[in-house]
């Protein structure tokens, strides 16, 4: 993410909106979320239940 910096060194968000109003930052995050969930599912493969950490106890 690209951030600006104030004179005090505190990061300032690139997108600032009114509280409760969805803006470009939220839309961009939603698009990334759509791709990340599918990528994670495909990374584990069809036999994900056989991976020890994913197996039921």
From Swiss-Prot:
Keywords: Heme, Hydrogen peroxide, Iron, Metal-binding, Oxidoreductase, Peroxidase. Belongs to the catalase family. Active from pH 6.0 to 10.0. Coiled coil: none annotated. Activity decreases at temperatures above 55 degrees Celsius. SUPFAM superfamilies: Heme-dependent catalase-like. Induction: Constitutively expressed. Inducible by oxidative stress in the exponential phase of bacterial growth. Its EC number is 1.11.1.6. Heme binds at residue 37. It catalyses: 2 H2O2 = O2 + 2 H2O. Homodimer. InterPro entries: Catalase_sf. This is Catalase-1. GO terms for molecular function: catalase activity; heme binding; metal ion binding. Its cofactor is heme. Decomposes hydrogen peroxide into water and oxygen; serves to protect cells from the toxic effects of hydrogen peroxide. It comes from Comamonas terrigena. One of its GO terms (biological process) is response to hydrogen peroxide.
